[in-house]
Amino acid sequence: MAEADPKMVTEPAAQGVAEEAMASSACDSGDESDSNSSSSTTSCGSTGSSSSSSSSSSSSSSSSSGSSGSSSNGSHLHQKKRVPGPSRRAQRRPSGKLFMDKLPQAVRNRVQALRNIQNECDKVDTLFLRAIHDLERKYAELNKPLYDKRFQIINAEYEPTEEECEWNSEEEFSGDEEMQDDTPNEMPPLEGEEEEEIGKENTEVKEEVKDVPEEVPEAKVEEEEAPKETSEVKTEEKEIPKEGPEEKAEEQESSKEFPEVKVEEKTDSTDCIDIAPEEKEDLKDVTQANAEYTDQPTEDSTPRAPVREAQKRVPETRPEERVNIKRARKGKPKKEDPPRGIPDYWLTVLKNVDKLGPMIQKCDEPILKFLSDVSLKFSNPGQPISYTFEFHFLPNPYFRNELLMKTYIIRSKPDHYDPFFAWGWEIEECKGCKIDWRRGKDVTVTTRSRPAITGEIEVQPRVVPNASFFNFFSPPEIPLIGKLEPKEDAILDEDFEIGQILHDNVILKSIYYFTGEINDPYYHDFRDYGNRKYYK
C-alpha cells in the first residue's frame, strides 16, 4: 500500500474542523457540506481497481469522515430551528484561545500558571465585594433612625422644631473662626530673651514678698480703730430714748388742733342751711321757663320730622343688607387647610431620576401620590449578595398591595470567561413581584377592539401591554439556555442601570432629587453610578 501524501491528508481534515466551527452559526453550511461529501463518495466508488488510485481512496476516506461529522451537526441544528447564542450565563469561548494555540508549549504552560494566579485574585475580589456588602448593611442600620424620622416628617407624623428647621451652614464654618481667634497675636520670644524675662519675674516676686509684712501693722491699726467705732454707736443708742418725750409733746399739740377742725365743719353745715332757700327760688324759675317753652312754637320743631321718617326707613333696609351679606359670604372661597407633611414627595423624587422620569406616565401619577416611603434592604450574612427595594403605599383605590418589592442579585462568583470581573458590582438577575390590581385599574395593560372584515366590532377586545412605571416590577426573565430578544435585552440593561442609581444615590440623597439640585449642570458632569460599566 502506497504512503499517503501529507498535504492531501491535512487539507480535508482542516476543512472538517472549519465546517464544525461554522455549523454553530448557520445551517446552510451544513447542507453544503452534505452535498460535497455525497459527491466525493460517489466519485470514489466509481474508480476502484487500479493500484494508482490508492492515494485518492485514502483522501476520500478522510474527507468522508470529516463530512459525516459535519452533516450530523447540521441536521441536528436544522431540527432545533434556533441557534443557541451566548447569554448572560452561558460560557463562551474566549477569542484569545486561538492566540494561545500559536504559542510554544513552554510559554503556554507559564501563561496557564498566570491564569491560576488570576483565579486566586478573583477569589480575593469576591471577599472584597462581600466585605463591602457587609459594611453597607452595617451602616444601613445606623441610617435607619434617620430614615424613620424622614418618613415621619414626610407623612405628617412628626413636626420638626424650630432648631431642626434652621440652616446650620454658619455652624459648619465656626470651627475655622475659633481656630483663628485662638492664635496668638504677638511673636514668641527668642531663646536668649526667655532667660532674661524669667530672671526679671523672679526679682519681682521677691519684692512683692518683702512688701507683705509692711502691710500687716496697718491692719492692726484698723482693728484698734474698730472698737472705738463700736463705742460711738453705743452712745448714739443711748441718746435715742431722750427723744421720746419730745414726740409725746408733739402728739398733744396735734390733739389740740383737732377741735378747730370740728368747729370749721360746723360752720360749713350752717352755710348749707342758709343756701337752701335760694336753690328753691331757682327751681321755681326753671319750671316757669319750661312752661313758656312748651306754649310757644319753636322753629326747631320743623326739621325734626324727617329725622323721624329716617328712623322708620332703617328697618326696611336692614333685611336687604343681610341678604347681600349672606350672598357675599357664599361667594367667598373657604380657607384651605395648610398642607400636611410634604405632599407628593416620592413622586417628585422619582420624576427627577434620569431613567425613571420618562417611565412615569400621566396615569401613574395619581397612584404614585400614595407612595409613602422607599427603603433599601440588604441580604443577610451567608446568603448570596443581593439588595431589595421596598415601595410602601398607603391604602388606595388602584391595587390591594401595601408593599411592592424589586430584588437585584449581584454576581459574587468569578467567571473564568469574563476578564473584567474585578471592575465592581455587576447585577446578574432581578426579580419583581405581582401587583394585585383592582378591577379595571390595571394601568400596565389596555384593551383595544378592532373591526372585523365583516365590519362588526369584536365582542372580546384584545389586551395590549401599556407603557407604565409599574412595568418596573415585572422585568423579563433571563433564560438559562439561549438569549433574550433585542428588545428584552435593552429593557433588562436599563433596568439594571436603574437599580444601580437607586442603590447609590436616590435612597441616600432623595432630598436633592426632590429639590432638583441633582439636575444642576455642575453635578451632572461629575455623576457616577458606582459601576464602571455605566459610568458617564
Curated annotation (Swiss-Prot):
InterPro entries in the record, alphabetically?
Answer: NAP-like_sf, NAP_family
* Low complexity: bias regions: 35-75
Q: What is the name of this protein?
A: Nucleosome assembly protein 1-like 3
Q: Where is this region: Disordered?
A: 1-104, 160-338
Which ranges are annotated Basic residues under compositional bias?
77-95
One term under GO cellular component: nucleus
Provide the disulphide bond pattern.
Answer: none
Instruction: Extract the Pfam families matched here.
Output: NAP
Source species of the chain: Rattus norvegicus (Rat)
Q: Where does it reside?
A: Nucleus
Q: Which SUPFAM superfamilies match?
A: NAP-like
GO MF term list: chromatin binding; histone binding
What family, per the record? Belongs to the nucleosome assembly protein (NAP) family.
- Acidic residues biased stretches: 160-184
> Per the record, where are the segments of Polar residues compositional bias?
287-300
